[in-house]
Amino acid sequence: MKHIIAVLIENELGALSRVVGLFSARGYNIESLTVAPTEDASLSRMTIVTTGSDDVIEQITKHLNRLIEVVKVVDLTEGHFTERELMLIKVRAVGKEREEMKRMADIFRGRIIDVTEKSYTIELTGDSSKLDAFLVAIDRASILETVRTGASGIGRGERILRV
């Protein structure tokens, strides 16, 4: 099962490396990883997407909590949360394809952010399944390049990740 783990970590040299090393040393897979500063300049927030049984996820959170730089760990998938990911996709858009690509972008509430004679670059946001559905819906042969940020997540309602 997919889990989104939010980690508050001290902004220190090598902290990210130790977290990634922990996953690597224990054979855990990281599907995506995002890191950004928080409202507190001394802390960063990591969002780690990984898969595993409940026992594996419990072990991951225990190991993360043992790292000195880690301030707090929350498995967002244990409660209600909002997940978003950004995808930029460059597609061939020539002739009849232009209108079809524009229509598909509109259906998925994407934005065309760059236009050339032969291509569109489309920006899409949503959960991973929405972005995957867009990729399935368009002709694979028209995809020139794709980049995705990986998931970011936040608890819903009063649920917050703070020290």
Residue ranges and their predicted role:
Residues M1-R45, V49-V163:
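Long, contiguous binding/interaction regions
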